[in-house]
Amino acid sequence: MKTLSAKPAEVTHDWYVVDADGKTLGRLATQIATRLRGKHKTCFTPHVDTGDFIVVINAEKIAVTGKKAQDKKYYRHSGYPGGIKETNFTKLIAHKPEDVLHKAVKGMLPKGPLGYAMIKKLKLYAGTEHPHEAQQPKELDI
């Protein structure tokens, strides 16, 4: 019996919608990263993008445990000397709720061209509405 190596043209990418309301940040991010990589499929091949499209709704209602809401820090840099900015979870979720989950999932994906292609298949929305009804996404219970 030979090992199956998936070809990019043979892979089908399904669409799933995930409701993040009340879910824990890290636990949800690991499940999403696994689906984006395609590790749940039998045809998983490390050098081929075999993952699915994931649409996340209610990103503003994601939860963290303990004191992470005040203690967890997020950094960004402008590119100029001394241009580092710092914010915490509470401020970031109020200003850009999609960025919290995006940063968590992006850190769990491989770095390089394949990882960049995988993160593009993640669609994040703060509310319940999303413009991907035409793709008929299936409900994914995580």
Curated annotation (Swiss-Prot):
GO molecular function: mRNA binding; structural constituent of ribosome
KW Ribonucleoprotein (keyword) present: yes
Annotated keywords: Ribonucleoprotein, Ribosomal protein
Pfam families: Ribosomal_L13
Biological process per Gene Ontology, one example term: translation
Any single GO CC term annotated in Swiss-Prot or TrEMBL for this entry: cytosolic large ribosomal subunit
Domain of life, source organism: Bacteria
PANTHER family attached to this UniProt entry: LARGE RIBOSOMAL SUBUNIT PROTEIN UL13M, RIBOSOMAL PROTEIN L13
Family statement: Belongs to the universal ribosomal protein uL13 family.
Quaternary context: Part of the 50S ribosomal subunit.
Annotated function: This protein is one of the early assembly proteins of the 50S ribosomal subunit, although it is not seen to bind rRNA by itself. It is important during the early stages of 50S assembly.
Protein's recorded name: Large ribosomal subunit protein uL13
Provenance organism: Psychrobacter arcticus (strain DSM 17307 / VKM B-2377 / 273-4)
